[in-house]
Amino acid sequence: MGKIKNKIVRQQQYMKALHQKNKDKLERRKERAKEEEKDPEKKRLRLSENIPATIESKRVYDETIIEDKPDEELQAELKDDEFSAYFSEERKVPKLLVTTSKRASRKCYDFASELLDCFPNAEFRKRTGDIEVHEIAEAAAKRGYTDLLVLNEDRKKTNALTLVHLPNGPSFYFTLSNLQTAKEISNHGRSTGHIPELIINNFSTRLGMTVARAFQSLFIQTPQIQGRQVVTIHCQRDFLFFRRHRYAFREKSNMPDGIGTGLQELGPRFTMRLRMVQKGVWDRKEGEVFFESNAGEESDRRKFWL
């Protein structure tokens, strides 16, 4: 076909060949459907082998991936890590301090207000003067706070979140994207002040477990089930999706008991990406960096850290 010099004739020949190719493909599919109708085992075998390749299935192996049953060494580490007091019989109660970057906008304050509603036993303090994050963390630890959450803003857009576990770290720095407050979510509900359930999903590495335990330590471990509220932090390809919903029960005639269930989003919703972990209290200049992943520097799309 490439030897045909006339453009119009060449296009006609190409379309004719393409039509014949599609026709043959359709005939093969019809023939295969007839065979599979006679022998269902052929269809089952074909579908079992026809598994599409995804980034997750081609994931680069990470030796820190945690199996379904953690080994004794990992269990010993978890018993002595910075968050162990929240998962032991002691059931330490978290106390979170929320603040913002200097001279934050109204939208950032609105977002902070909604976070206070998400995290039980959280308080907000407006940031004044030139006090730095490590100084705020030191003062907060003396006043009995267990965690510090700082919202960062750039050009009146909330773009990052710093989470510091008190009094001695670790500290986590996340970039934020796709932020929507409750009033920006269509048909959103209103929270009732109950302690929510927490769903942490798909954290599979040792670093991922540390991040998951950091978020778990922000919530009281005894949710008030009657409130029917749930906070979900879902990890997919190292993106952390934050959502808050309420279980809703509605009358449905097609259900056996006449009642159907659903979810009503309460907000806010946003996406996080872990960029840095420091071993101690957050200090941008002198902090000891344990993990760092800068935007745009990912060498392999199949490599996941969490």
Swiss-Prot record:
GO MF terms held by the record: rRNA primary transcript binding
GO biological process, one term: maturation of 5.8S rRNA from tricistronic rRNA transcript (SSU-rRNA, 5.8S rRNA, LSU-rRNA)
Region (Disordered): 16-49
Bias kind Basic and acidic residues: ranges: 21-42
Domain of life of the organism encoding this protein: Eukaryota
Domain spans labelled Brix: 94-283
Pfam families per UniProt: Brix
InterPro entries per the UniProt record, alphabetical: Brix (IPR007109), IMP4/RPF1 (IPR044281)
Cellular component GO terms held in the UniProt record: nucleolus; nucleus; preribosome; preribosome, large subunit precursor; sno(s)RNA-containing ribonucleoprotein complex
Cystine bridges: none
Record-given protein name: Brix domain-containing protein C4F8.04
